[in-house]
Amino acid sequence: SRGLGDVYKRQIINGLVLDLHAVKQRDPAASGYLPTLLFSKGFLALQTHRASNYFLNSKESLMASFLHSQSSKLYGVDIHPAASIGVGVMLDHATGIVIGETSVIEDDVSIFQGVTLGGTGKVTGDRHPKVRQGVLISAGAKILGNVEIGQGAKVAAGSVVLDNVEMNTTVAGVPAVAVGKPSSDSPAITVDHTIEE
């Protein structure tokens, strides 16, 4: 219906504004809003996902698949159109990020290059990670299966997460284990990749 389309469009615009602010606030290399809007591939891939998700929810799956395919080719970022992504999200550097179909990413999350939110095999249904608010996922981390990354958690670079991560916990390693607590309640905002003990 037309009313539903208007709601989705407002959500897309709200997401764009808050994502743009997130990049400007968290990325020291972001020189301003306009360059981010025009050239940041993580930001652009995320906005393309928002459009493809809109088309998927509007029963226009062919257009959703087309946008997904083109975004993957152009930006090197693979976000399934059905993935649920909140606002104020930053995909930094972005190359090689993969976000599976049933993934859920809440508001104010920061994800770095080479991160995978994937399944563990041929299981169907709800099979991808759930990333709660304020989470920081560092470069190259792999989070596999229907696991929950608790609010304010931090996943260290190169980690392989196969189990739930408690809120406000830092995990590292292969397989990942708890190694400490983040220095803030929202590591996605402070973007501190160090491991505290």
Predicted feature residues:
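Short, small-residue-biased leader/transition segments that mark boundaries at the very start
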Residues: S1-Y8
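Extended, small-residue-rich solenoid/repeat segments and analogous flexible loops
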Residues: V17, S31-L38, F43-I97
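Short, charged, intrinsically disordered terminal tails
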Residues: S184-I195
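A generic structural signal for secondary-structure junctions
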Residues: L56, A176, S183-S184
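Structural signal for interior beta-strand "rungs" in well-ordered beta-sheet cores
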Residues: S72-V179
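Non-catalytic extracellular/periplasmic "stalk"
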Residues: R10-N14
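Conserved alpha/beta enzyme-core scaffold
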Residues: V23-R26
